[in-house]
Curated annotation (Swiss-Prot):
The chain crosses the membrane at residues 7-24, 29-46, 145-165, 174-194. It is a multi-pass membrane protein. Its cofactor is Zn(2+). This is Protease HtpX homolog. It is found in: Cell inner membrane. It comes from Cereibacter sphaeroides (strain ATCC 17029 / ATH 2.4.9). Binds 1 zinc ion per subunit. Its EC number is 3.4.24.-. Zn(2+) binds at residues 130, 134, 203. The gene is htpX. The active site is at residue 131.
Length: 300
């Protein structure tokens, strides 16, 4: 089912990409956009996870350097009944995390240095479980493809500023100044709306399943509250440079969108916390974090 959703998404984003190309360069622009889109579809399926990790400067965690963290992730993956994903660390003080990969067998979880410093081991377990839920649900390919295409559509729309008003070799003049300006605004907005629809619909489900994986909904609820508060005060420079990836994070890392609920990439954090607290009232509780002592590990 995950591949079906991803195929539909690729078709929608490809159509949007072709539309932008046609508006910029008429028939020739559409043909060029089609060729680019075909290449992007292949690239995003096989390599988009590595591209996103590279955008954020993530480096793979050595199990010997952070055994407690590594064992925590492995224990949660075992509890979720899925393969152990690769584990990456992002060197930023903002607490946050995301998952990526085309399927559970080829997946990665990336956490920030700020997350490991600001949260308790229990809260980190809640966050990791949320990301594992995205992987198990096969949301990660969907979100990574969206991020790649949204960024490309935004760049293509910006090209319209330079080429949109000029005539092509057939004498066509697809866009004037007004059309160019409209395209620069509307194309990224359309891509962003697709991102928002996907992220909002999947976050609640990942919260629910993540809480089941770690066995303590309140661990994740507490983590979300801390991350939300700190993310609004601490910069994530690489996320600001790559806003198309914002919907992949557990909490929106962008300051500019933090209070804009109309165009938010995530559901309201207070509502997510309330849902987890309601879940905790009737849920059986796990007694400990999988395979890790109840202390701060050597990952600070």
């Amino acid at each position: 089912m995950g591949y079906v959703r991803t195929g539909i998404l690729m078709a929608v984003m490809t159509a949007l990409f072709l539309g932008v190309g046609a508006l910029i360069g008429g028939q020739s622009g559409a043909i060029i956009a089609l060729v680019i889109a075909a290449g992007m579809n292949l690239f995003t399926f096989w390599n988009s996870d590595r591209a996103v990790l590279s955008m954020h400067g993530a480096h793979e965690v050595d199990p010997r350097a952070a055994p407690d963290l590594y064992n925590m992730v492995r224990g949660l993956a075992d509890r979720a009944g899925m393969p152990m994903p690769k584990l990456y660390l992002i060197e930023t003080d903002q607490p946050n995390a995301f998952a990526t990969g085309r399927n559970p067998e080829n997946a990665a979880v990336a956490v920030t240095r700020g997350l490991l410093r600001a949260l308790t081991p229990e809260e980190v377990a809640g966050v990791v479980a949320h990301e594992l839920a995205h992987i198990r649900n096969r949301d990660t390919l969907l979100m990574t493809v969206t991020a790649t295409f949204a960024g490309a559509i935004s760049m293509l729309a910006n090209f319209a500023f330079f080429f949109g008003g000029s005539s092509n070799e057939e004498g066509e003049r697809p866009m004037g100044l007004v059309g160019t300006l409209a395209l620069m605004f509307l194309a990224p907005l359309a891509a962003g709306l697709v991102q928002m629809a996907i992220s909002r619909s999947r976050e609640y489900e990942a919260d629910r399943i993540g809480a089941e994986i770690c066995g303590r909904p309140l661990w994740l609820a507490s983590a979300l509250g801390k991350i939300e508060g700190l993310a609004q005060r601490i910069d994530n420079v690489r996320a600001e440079r790559n806003p198309a990836t914002a919907h992949m994070f557990i909490v929106n890392p962008l300051h500019a969108m933090g209070h804009d609920r109309l165009f938010a990439t995530h559901p309201n954090t207070a509502n997510r916390i309330a849902a987890l607290r309601a879940m905790a009232e009737g849920a059986p509780q796990a007694s400990r974090i999988p395979r890790v002592a109840a202390r701060r590990g050597p990952w600070n």
